[in-house]
């Protein structure tokens, strides 16, 4: 036990079973990771926190995935350990795995999940640190919410895909915002 938490092996079994690549994030972070995370951040939300012996908390975030069948190998919900002094929170939100959609990250979380978290806990001027960027949906939600964002990803391939995906997303959002502003301007001219 170090710093109030211990580390155990996590993940990798599902990926190996289905022929997916196993990378560094399939293993539990080292104790130094948690030491540094708690040092540099005021509050923490740690997805998969139920796999680590972290300090006791009041606020677990629970993401219920109503579209996952009971006989499927994926979890029907995910837990995030949360350092905030709040009651536990639950959101029911379909996973990002929709038929025909292309997904390139095995643990992708929907943008709507991060939108919900940021609406609950963030304030203007807050900075988001995501040390497990993955698909980059947390970055997209932070962009939409106007929050400052810093993200890290251990896998160079996922990082490159996530950056390209974010650039396309931001360009699309900018176009929508520009069209909305022009439309609002046209409406004002008609009045």
Where on the chain are the PLM-derived regions?
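Class I S-adenosyl-L-methionine
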Residues: 1-191
């Amino acid at each position: 036990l170090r710093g109030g938490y211990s580390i155990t092996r996590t993940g990798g079994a599902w990926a190996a079973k289905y022929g997916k690549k196993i990378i560094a994030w399939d293993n539990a972070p080292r104790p130094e990771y948690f030491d540094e995370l708690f040092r540099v951040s005021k509050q923490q939300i740690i997805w998969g926190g139920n796999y680590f012996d972290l300090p006791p908390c009041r606020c677990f975030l629970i993401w219920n995935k109503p579209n996952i069948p009971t006989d499927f190998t994926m979890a029907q919900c995910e837990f995030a350990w949360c350092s905030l002094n709040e009651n536990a929170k639950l959101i029911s939100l379909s996973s990002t795995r929709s038929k025909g959609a292309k997904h390139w990250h095995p643990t992708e979380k929907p943008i709507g999940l991060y939108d919900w978290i940021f609406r609950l806990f963030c304030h203007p001027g807050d900075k988001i640190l995501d040390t497990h960027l993955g698909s980059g949906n947390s970055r997209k939600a932070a962009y939409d919410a106007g929050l400052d964002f810093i993200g890290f990803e251990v896998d160079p391939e996922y990082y490159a895909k996530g950056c390209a995906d974010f650039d396309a997303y931001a360009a699309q959002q900018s176009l929508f915002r520009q069209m909305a502003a022009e439309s609002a301007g046209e409406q004002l001219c008609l009045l």
